[in-house]
Amino acid sequence: MLCGCDEGTIYPDETIDSGRTASVTVTFKGIDAWPKENYLSLAAFGTDTQIPLLTKRISKPTIDGRERTVKLNNLSPDTKSINIAIISNGKKVIYSYCNQPVENNGENIEINFGELELASFKRIQSQVFKTNCLSCHGESSSGLAGNLDLRENTAYKSLVNVKAPVSEEGMNYVTPGDPHNSFILEILEENPIHKDMFNSTGKQEILALIKTWIQEGAPNN
């Protein structure tokens, strides 16, 4: 004798959507600067913009410049904004690219962030210089190491097309479009004082970020 099933739950409760969904359309540019140690994520934030309520890792696309849509399900009623951000394994916000405030009206959310440049100078300033470099290049009472000021309002003009005084080859710190003639990469890769500033994966992420930015013309973006 065959018996049919009643309306009992077939799937685990956690697979059932219980909140709103955010559908985000975005085009990634400069995917060679995709994070390696950290995670590029779609994230929902409440009133605290440093601790996400919910995150979803975004997988790296195979082709630069292709539009894609990413969804974030089960949004909390406390959600105040949807962001695309680089987030550490410990859920720390490393850098936020863009955010969209949202209302708690019960409706699903659709956002188009357009083109997102992964290798931006703002990301370099926030993720690299502000976190690791200012003690010697901006905040030291003994002066600027290498005559290089990496504070936010001066970093770009201190780097781009500026001769590095300690470069034996007379290279610029940054030569737009030419990573091989940009002394900043040599400093981070080979200089004894700087080469151990990051762990292996973190160093790969930083070097790829700066190299991609230089290859794309070193814009002040």
Residue ranges and their predicted role:
Residues 5-22, 26-30, 35-56, 61-66, ...:
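Aromatic- and Gly/Pro-enriched helix-to-coil junctions and flexible linker segments
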Residues 68-70:
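Short strand-edge motifs at loop-to-beta-strand transitions and within beta-strands
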